[in-house]
Structures are given as C-alpha cells and as structure tokens.
C-alpha cells in the first residue's frame, strides 16, 4: 500500500520540478510574455498530473507524454542544452525559421495552452462520466483464452514463424515501407501487410502477454516475443518508433504496479536491458536501410534494394565504429524530433492568413506526386520534393494541435482538443470492453490513436481510414471468439 501512495508523489514531484525548471530556462533566454509562459507550463504540469493520478487511462498517459515532449520540453530544451555546452536546433526540418518575433512566440504559447486546457477538461469529464479502470484485474475467460491455454505452444510457434515470414517478405518484395512509394501490386496485399505490420501482429502479442501476465505464468517469454515482433516489424517498415512499443509494455507493467499487483523486479529489469539493446539496434539498422534507399543506384531496379550488394555490405558493418554515431542519432531524435511547438510557431508566423475557410481548405488536401504537403508549402515555404531513383515521400507534419490552429481561433483549438480527448476515452473504453478486459491491448490501441493524432496533418481523410483500422484491430477478437464458439473446436 505504501508503494501505491509513494509512487504518484515521486512522479508529481518530478513533473513539478521539470516544468518549473523549463519555465525558468525559457523566460531567461526568450523575450516573451512571462505570464503567458507561466500559464503554458502550469497547464503542462496539470496535464501530466491529471493523466497519471486518480482513475487514469492509457490514452491520456500517452497523449500527455507526447504533448509535453512536443511543446514545453521542445521549447526549452535548446536553452537547457546550451547551458551544458551543446547546441540543438529547434527547427531541424527548416533552419530558416529560427528568427521568430516576440508576437509569434506569444501567440504560439497561447494557442498551445488552449489545446492543452482542452485535453485537461476532457480528462476531468472522462473521469466523472465516461470510463476508468477498476483496481481489480478480472480475466474474462472466453473461447480465445481457452483456445490459447489448450494450444499455447503451437500457437506461439506458428506466430513466430508468421511474423518472421511477413517481415522478410515485406522487406524483400518492398511491399510497405514508411516514406517510400513502391509500385507493388496487387494493392490489397499492401493494405493487408500495412495493417499486420502496424497493428495486427502486435495485437496478437498483446493478447499473449495479457493471458500469461494475468494468470501469472511465464509472461517473460511472451513479453520478449512482444518486443521481438515489434522490433522486426519496425525495421521492416523502416521505422525508428520501436521505443514507443517498448513504452506500451512498461507502462502496462506500471499500471499493474500502481494497482498493487506484484511483478518480479528481476524480470522487469532483464526485459528493460533487452529492450534498450533492441532500441539501439533498431535505430542503427533502420538508419542504414534508409541510406540504402537514398543511395540506390540501380536505375533498372533489377536488384532488390534491401538485398542489394551495397546494402548488405553496409549491414555487415553494423557495429563497426557505429556506437558513437548511433548515440548521436538517438540524442538527436530524443531532443529535436518531437512534433509540437515548432510547427505551432510556423503556423503563427502566418497569423494574418489564419481563418476557418483556410482550415477547411487544408482539410480538402489531396495527394499529388512529387508535391509537398499543404503545411510544407504554405507554412514552411517548401515546394517540390527531392527526387531519387526510388520515390521517397518524406512529409513534415504539424500535429493535431497546430493543425487546429490554422482556424485562427483559440476557442476552436480548445474545443477540438476537448473532443479529441473524449473520442480517445471512448475508444479505450470500447477496446477494453470488446477485448474482454485486455488492458494491454487497450493500451496498444490508445497508443496507435495518440501517435496518429500527434503526427496529424497530411491527407486528413486517411486518418479516418486509419481510425477504422484501429477499431477493427480490437473488434477482430470478438469475431474470433464467435467463430470458435460456432465451430466448437474446444
């Protein structure tokens, strides 16, 4: 019980200390309105506070972490780094946007605060009227659970073979990689592979971990399996976001710990060490595979990109003199790549153009090959995409809060963020209910939704399709349960 009480106190103290420290770094280095900055950091503190205390859900935890990293943290970190003798560019994608006026900073802080307040009010409403987890973790035994218990080793063996095969075929046939447009056919296979690699395979791993964790069986093995599947899938799609999948697992452990469910410290520690090693390898390998795309010289495209001679030679040098380079890459990603305040300032720099009609114009954006996104064209003054032999499609995204600011209305930003918070709460509620109380799967579902909205801002209609895919990801288990009931296999 003492651990249950102490734990939030430590988190709250750290939260308060960090926000106060960042506030003083900002007001001593930037010519901005100190009162606006105070409200900005106070609202950031309360967002984390409400997300990690009293009737918490995973959606709000993930959302508050991403928002905090993208806004208060990213605004202050260049000056924190400077005090230690390091230099960090607040705008790594567009260095010409370093000289903003005082008014732009103040407007960006005010609009950001409105969005954060919208999330806070949504959290308050959610706790009172919508959904929160009970302290009891009751496993709802269903046909899927009985099937897993009866055929566990066969299921896990088939699963391992399946995810290894899917990842290999995806890389070899170049079916789906982030930021790259291939001409793979048939198109329905791209959709299937995309769903499996982004959501499907991991959703099954969430079930395996949940069943073993709740029944207090060998959850270490299925946790390792969850990490390995996420690791290989992220490499296969050239994503460096594996660290967030790690976060899902450990935030789930933290959720159990808060509710006084005992988990072996030695198991958590060994999983953490293993996860850190995989994070290092994920960033290293993915960076090299991305370089294979950029440096690909086979005009006839006879040679497979990721299995070409040059690419394979590059991979063999994986750990040769690469440690410092990978650490620098991790440092860069940790400090500069969060989506938030930089895009808000880019939007506020064109404040005279912002209105609801302009916002609606952005909502109608359509994909045009070799063209930059609307955000890049109209706010970052970028035009044509760079062309390579392989058609890369790297997009700079403003994020949900900054995107809503295109309306030019603080109230609209507040209301949009409030509505998003309510939608996220209901999504987690339904995913928890329809997955038979599988809180690890509902954590994964909430992460998928938060990650998409934090990186919102290109082809908005595609986000609706992505949302439907998320809903299917947890509803599929209702379908499997129904099928098992009908065929009476148990």
Predicted segments with their positions:
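Hydrophobic alpha-helical segments
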Residues: 392-490
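N-terminal "leader" segments that precede or initiate the main folded domain
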Residues: 1-140, 247-284, 459-483
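Small-residue-enriched transmembrane helix-hairpin modules in multi-pass membrane proteins
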Residues: 183-187, 279-420
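Hydrophobic alpha-helical membrane-insertion segments
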Residues: 60-78, 154-167, 275, 359-369
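Central hydrophobic cores of alpha-helical transmembrane segments
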Residues: 61-72, 222-230, 267-274, 417-421, ...
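Membrane-interfacial loop-to-transmembrane alpha-helix junctions, especially the N-terminal start
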Residues: 5-15, 56-70, 152-155, 217-224, ...
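Membrane-embedded catalytic interface detector for glycan/lipid assembly enzymes
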Residues: 31-34, 90-100, 123-263, 267, ...
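Hydrophobic, membrane-inserted alpha-helices
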Residues: 17-24, 43-46, 203-207, 224-232, ...
């Amino acid at each position: 019980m003492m651990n249950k009480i102490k734990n939030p106190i430590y988190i709250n103290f750290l939260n308060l200390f960090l926000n106060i420290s960042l506030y003083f770094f900002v007001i001593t280095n930037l010519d901005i309105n100190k009162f606006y900055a105070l409200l900005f950091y106070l609202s950031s503190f309360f967002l984390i506070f409400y997300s990690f205390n009293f009737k918490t859900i995973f959606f709000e935890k993930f959302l508050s972490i991403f928002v905090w990293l993208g806004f208060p943290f990213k605004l202050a970190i260049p000056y924190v780094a400077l005090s230690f003798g390091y230099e960090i560019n607040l705008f790594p994608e567009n260095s010409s946007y370093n000289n903003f006026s005082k008014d732009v900073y103040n407007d960006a802080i005010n609009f950001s605060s409105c969005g954060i307040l919208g999330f806070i009010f949504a959290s308050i409403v959610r706790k009172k009227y919508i959904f929160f987890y009970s302290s009891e973790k009751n496993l709802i035994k269903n046909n899927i659970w009985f099937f897993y218990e009866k055929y566990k080793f066969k299921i896990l063996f088939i699963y391992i073979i399946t995810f290894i095969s899917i990842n290999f075929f995806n890389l070899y046939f170049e079916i789906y990689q982030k930021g790259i447009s291939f001409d793979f056919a048939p198109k329905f296979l791209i959709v299937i592979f995309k769903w499996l690699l982004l959501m499907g395979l991991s959703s099954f791993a969430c079930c395996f971990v949940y069943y073993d964790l709740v029944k207090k069986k060998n959850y270490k093995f299925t946790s390792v399996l969850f990490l390995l599947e996420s690791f290989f899938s992220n490499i296969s799609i050239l994503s460096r976001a594996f660290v967030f999948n790690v976060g899902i697992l450990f935030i789930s452990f933290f959720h159990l710990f808060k509710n006084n469910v005992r988990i072996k410290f030695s198991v958590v520690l060994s999983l953490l060490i293993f996860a850190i090693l995989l994070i290092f390898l994920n960033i290293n390998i993915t960076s090299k595979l991305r370089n294979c795309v950029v440096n690909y010289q086979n005009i006839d495209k006879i040679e497979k990109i990721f299995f070409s001679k040059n690419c394979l030679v590059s991979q063999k040098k994986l750990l040769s003199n690469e440690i410092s380079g990978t650490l620098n890459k991790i440092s860069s990603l940790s400090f500069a790549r969060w989506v938030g305040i930089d895009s808000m300032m880019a939007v506020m720099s064109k404040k005279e153009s912002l209105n609801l009609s302009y916002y609606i114009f952005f909502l109608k954006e359509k994909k045009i090959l070799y063209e930059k996104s609307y955000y890049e064209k109209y706010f970052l003054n970028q035009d044509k995409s760079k062309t390579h032999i392989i058609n890369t499609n790297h997009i700079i995204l403003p994020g949900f809060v900054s995107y809503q600011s295109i309306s030019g209305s603080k109230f609209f930003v507040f209301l949009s963020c409030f509505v998003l918070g309510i939608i996220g709460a209901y999504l987690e509620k339904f995913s928890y209910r329809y997955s038979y109380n599988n809180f690890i799967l509902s954590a994964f579902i909430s992460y998928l939704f938060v990650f998409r909205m934090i990186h919102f801002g290109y082809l908005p209609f595609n986000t609706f399709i992505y949302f439907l895919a998320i809903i299917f990801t947890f509803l599929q288990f209702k379908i499997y349960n129904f099928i098992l009931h009908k065929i009476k296999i148990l």
